[in-house]
Amino acid sequence: GALSPWKIIVFKGKSRQTFGKSFLGKRFKELNPSASEDDVFYEENRFLRAGVVVCVVSSPVPHKKIPIWEMQLSSAAVCQNILLCAQSLGYAAQWLTEWYSYDQVITQELTNNNNDRISGFIYIGKKENEPKERIRPELSKVVSYWEEF
């Protein structure tokens, strides 16, 4: 234990816009050469939707007793805990994995490590109105009970 197989990168203040213009917008344009100026502008300003954006990175540490999968789960738990903590303090918070979470060029820029993977970006900000509740699965369809006979 105690490996901490994850990293946290915080974007706040001007770093949100700098990263957007220097990397997100530029990379989006490379991937979508026919994208409209409005679409590129949207990507450049994506991180401005919240006061703070937290990037959680799964960064497995070689270990003979702990499988990679468990380390990846640890990174996801970090995301969920940040989300729950922010919401419990009254902030609006959302965990997103959009195109840039899976882009190897963006991941390399952020981590400088080919083995790292982005677990998600958590947007945290002031709650202006109550967010819409998403459709959730019916518990009876996803929960079962094992009983020994």
Name the predicted role of every residue range.
Residues 54, 60-107:
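Small-aliphatic-rich amphipathic alpha-helix that forms the alpha element of a beta-alpha
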Residues 106-119:
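Short, electropositive alpha-helical surface patch
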Residues 1-49:
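N-terminal amphipathic, basic helical "cap/leader" segment at the start of enzyme domains
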Residues 28, 48-61:
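Acidic-glycine-rich active-site phosphate/pyrophosphate-binding loop
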Residues 118-149:
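C-terminal helix-cap and adjacent tail motif
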Residues 26-35, 65-69, 109-110:
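Short, surface-exposed loop/helix-turn segments at secondary-structure junctions
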Residues 38-41, 106-109, 130:
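Glycine-rich, charged/polar anion/phosphate-binding loops
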